[in-house]
C-alpha cells in the first residue's frame, strides 16, 4: 500500500509540493477574504439598519408634522368661517337699528297700520334668521351687567333702584355667547 502511494506521487515533479503549498496558501487567503467579506457584509447590514431607522424616524416626524399642519388648517378654516359670520353680523347691526327705528316711528304714527305690521313681521323674520346662525339680542332686564351693557347715562327713577337699567338706548347683540356690541343703557341714580 505504501508502494502504491509512492507510485502515485512518483510522477509528480519536485515543484508540485510547492504548488500544494501555494494552493493551501491560496485557500487560506480565500478563507480570510471570505471572513473579511462576511465582516464587511455585517458592517453594511448594520449601516443599512441605522440608515433605515433614521429614515423611518424622519418619516414619522414628517408625517406627524403633516398631520399637525392639517389639523391647524382645519381649525383655521373653521375659525375663519366663524369670524366671517361675526363680520357679517356686525355689518347687519346698523340695518337692524334702522328697522327698529322705523318700527318705533311707525308705531308712534299708527300702531295698526299695514306698514307697522309689515315692519313687525320683517323684524320677526330677521331675528329668526339671526338666531339660527347664533346671533341674538342681549337681554336688558333689571340688572346692569358690565359684560353685556354699556351705561351711557345715569337718570333719576322713582320705579328703579340705584344701578338698575332704566332704558335701553341701543340694542346689544352677541354671537355664540360673545358680545358683538354691548347694549347701550341708562341706569338709575337716585342719590
UniProtKB/Swiss-Prot annotation:
Keywords: Chaperone, Cytoplasm, Stress response. GO terms for molecular function: adenyl-nucleotide exchange factor activity; protein homodimerization activity; protein-folding chaperone binding; unfolded protein binding. Transmembrane segments: none annotated. Residues 1-19, 29-45 have a biased composition (Basic and acidic residues). It comes from the Bacteria. Participates actively in the response to hyperosmotic and heat shock by preventing the aggregation of stress-denatured proteins, in association with DnaK and GrpE. It is the nucleotide exchange factor for DnaK and may function as a thermosensor. Unfolded proteins bind initially to DnaJ; upon interaction with the DnaJ-bound protein, DnaK hydrolyzes its bound ATP, resulting in the formation of a stable complex. GrpE releases ADP from DnaK; ATP binding to DnaK triggers the release of the substrate protein, thus completing the reaction cycle. This is Protein GrpE. The lineage of its organism: Bacteria, Pseudomonadati, Campylobacterota, Epsilonproteobacteria, Campylobacterales.
Amino acid at each position: 500500500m505504501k508502494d502504491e502511494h509512492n507510485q502515485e506521487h512518483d510522477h509528480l515533479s519536485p515543484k508540485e509540493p510547492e504548488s500544494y503549498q501555494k494552493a493551501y496558501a491560496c485557500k487560506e487567503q480565500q478563507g480570510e477574504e471570505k471572513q473579511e467579506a462576511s465582516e464587511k457584509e455585517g458592517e453594511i447590514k448594520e449601516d443599512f439598519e441605522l440608515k433605515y431607522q433614521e429614515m423611518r424616524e424622519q418619516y414619522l416626524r414628517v408625517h406627524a408634522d403633516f398631520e399637525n399642519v392639517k389639523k391647524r388648517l382645519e381649525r383655521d378654516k373653521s375659525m375663519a368661517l366663524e369670524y366671517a359670520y361675526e363680520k357679517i353680523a356686525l355689518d347687519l347691526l346698523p340695518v337692524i337699528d334702522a328697522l327698529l327705528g322705523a318700527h318705533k316711528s311707525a308705531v308712534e304714527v299708527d300702531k295698526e297700520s299695514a306698514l307697522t305690521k309689515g315692519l313687525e313681521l320683517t323684524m320677526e323674520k330677521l331675528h329668526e334668521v339671526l338666531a339660527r346662525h347664533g346671533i341674538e339680542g342681549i337681554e336688558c332686564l333689571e340688572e346692569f351687567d358690565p359684560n353685556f351693557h354699556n351705561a351711557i347715562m345715569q337718570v333719576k327713577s322713582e320705579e328703579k333702584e340705584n344701578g338698575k337699567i332704566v332704558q335701553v338706548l341701543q340694542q346689544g347683540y352677541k354671537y355664540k355667547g360673545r358680545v358683538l356690541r354691548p347694549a347701550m343703557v341708562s341706569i338709575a341714580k337716585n342719590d
